[in-house]
Amino acid sequence: MDYSEIMVRHGELSTKGKNRMRFINKLKNNIQDVLAPFPAITVRSDRDRTHVSLNGTDYQPIVEALKLVFGVQALSPVYKLEKSVPLLVTAVQDIMTSLYRDGLTFKIATKRSDHAFELDSRELNSLLGGAVFEVLPNIQAQMKHPDVTLKVEIRDEAAYISYEEIKGAGGLPVGTSGKGMLMLSGGIDSPVAGYLALKRGLDIEVVHFASPPYTSPGALAKAQDLTRRLTRFGGNIQFIEVPFTEIQEEIKNKAPEAYLMTLTRRFMMRITDAIREQRKGLVIVNGESLGQVASQTLESMQAINAVTSTPIIRPVVTMDKLEIIEMAQAIDTFDISIQPFEDCCTIFAPDRPKTNPKLGNAEKYEERFDIDGLVQRAVSGIIVTEITPEIVNDEVENLIDALL
């Protein structure tokens, strides 16, 4: 027998009361986005489950994709069949025969939500267990901690049989907690911050600052590849490329070296906030970790934050670098993040950046700039690209190969 579908069990959605179906429908849409590379797949949801019909597709890559989607508590490959006792008997016998090995223990666990079905749960357990003994007389039943628990569900529309429960990613479906702008540089920390924001249901749009010719096409492709990795957790993500060359040249030419980083990040924050307002976001997300670099001291954060009253979420703020690296490796962004392309945060980095910049000094130096004009030109020049989970050639690897 081949699996018919993957049955998805919802996570925290069970606590959402009147909003439950909104959360479930969002999860369904996210699953459809993530499984877009598999055109034969169909997805439907009810209050208790989401059903991913395989329609002949190999189940293993579908399971691997679904394991990453936020809002999924657990999933099981299942056999779907008509609610017929003879069909159930045959299916149970075939499944257990395929799983059998010497010393294997099992139990039948039946749940009947269709109370019009001819047998109740106790009767089905007895009948189906007896059917297994008919074809496997040496198998042993074990009610506590068996090797195989064969789950049989009798629902209104069909019967379902499964024996494997796979842990999902948990969290909330992406998009159920509003929209935020993720400041993604291309380093290790910001993709991890994006992952953690996605886990709590935030629909992120990625803001990436590009400063050609100082930053290369490889840096841009790297940021887009990182964004594509994040789409595995909840579907398509809008990637917003911001032209930043003019601003960086202005800062380099007119500001003291010690304040280059502070002023650069204040401009980045202003621009991200303007894009957030334009695109109806609620928060800004970044990958700052307290004390990790000069721009991430409390004094620096205060001086940079002063340009906006928008809430700023820093998911990795209390994490050690090693913890962030381990999480980056776990979500498969680390190898991309360490590829050798400079981003706009590093191209004009001073040798000794100010670790305790004064807000008054930052504001005084900014009097040398046409702040509104610079921000407006940057925002008007953004390029928005929708990044999907579809499998594409790795642009960054191709660019690295060309350099070698």
UniProtKB/Swiss-Prot annotation:
Q: Which SMART domains match?
A: THUMP
GO annotation terms (biological process): thiamine biosynthetic process; thiamine diphosphate biosynthetic process; thiazole biosynthetic process; tRNA 4-thiouridine biosynthesis
Q: Which Pfam families match?
A: ThiI (PF02568), ThiI_fer (PF22025), THUMP (PF02926)
| UniProt keyword ATP-binding, yes or no | yes
Which segments constitute the THUMP domain? 60-165
Question: Which EC numbers does the record give?
Answer: 2.8.1.4
Membrane-spanning ranges? none
Where does the source fall among the domains of life? Bacteria
Question: Where primarily located?
Answer: cytoplasm
Q: What does the UniProt record say this protein does?
A: Catalyzes the ATP-dependent transfer of a sulfur to tRNA to produce 4-thiouridine in position 8 of tRNAs, which functions as a near-UV photosensor. Also catalyzes the transfer of sulfur to the sulfur carrier protein ThiS, forming ThiS-thiocarboxylate. This is a step in the synthesis of thiazole, in the thiamine biosynthesis pathway. The sulfur is donated as persulfide by IscS.
Q: What is this protein called?
A: Probable tRNA sulfurtransferase
The protein's gene is named: thiI
